[in-house]
């Protein structure tokens, strides 16, 4: 093993960890993108840097200067809410990872989830699995957009602490935003690229 890491703190804005290199040196590091999966990515990057001869200080500086990219775990803070913009693409594993990030937030948690593409005959079951996971994580409100999210919404609605709503398309959800999104909400926005969810992010920013 080139190195190890110890998770220290996570929140919806960032994560911190301690990275220990093979030579025994260690350093505290702030990963400016939220999520334990992003910490794992940072550790992988640190391993590559160490192998290439970078110092601990250089590795730390590189990780901590990681830019936030729209559509990829990008945090947007407005006057009314925090938006977790992870809408570039989606699959069942990344959906669950994004729900985990949302679950770090303090306050009401809303997951706006759209179709996941290219799942073939397993699409209905895998969307349902994500809905079950959202309910298990006690997401307060799950909004499914698109035909494939019907099973997701159905399963999410079975959660004792989860409300679930289904919308046929982006436009119908956008029209409902003033009625369902509240001041102080934390809102995850995620779907496959073809769903054009940047449109959803923009509408939330305009609220």
Predicted ranges, named:
Residues 15-20:
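Short polybasic amphipathic segments
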């Amino acid at each position: 093993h080139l190195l190890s890491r110890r998770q220290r703190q996570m929140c919806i804005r960032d994560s911190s960890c301690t990275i220990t290199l093979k030579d025994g040196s260690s350093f505290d590091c702030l990963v400016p993108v939220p999520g334990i999966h992003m910490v794992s990515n940072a550790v992988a990057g640190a391993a590559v840097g160490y192998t290439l001869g970078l110092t601990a200080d250089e590795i730390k500086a590189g990780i901590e200067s990681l830019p936030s990219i729209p559509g990829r775990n990008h945090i947007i803070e407005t006057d009314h809410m925090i938006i977790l913009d992870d809408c570039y693409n989606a699959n069942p594993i990344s959906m669950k990872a994004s729900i985990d990030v949302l679950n770090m937030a303090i306050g009401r948690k809303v997951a706006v989830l759209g179709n996941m593409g290219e799942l073939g005959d397993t699409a209905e079951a895998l969307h349902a699995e994500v809905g079950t996971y959202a309910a298990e994580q006690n997401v307060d409100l799950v909004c499914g957009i698109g035909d494939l999210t019907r099973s997701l919404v159905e399963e999410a609605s079975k959660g004792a602490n989860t409300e679930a709503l289904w919308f046929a398309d982006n436009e119908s959800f956008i029209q409902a935003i003033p009625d369902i999104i509240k001041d102080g909400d934390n809102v995850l926005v995620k779907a496959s690229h073809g769903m054009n969810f940047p449109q959803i992010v923009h509408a939330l920013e305009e609220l």
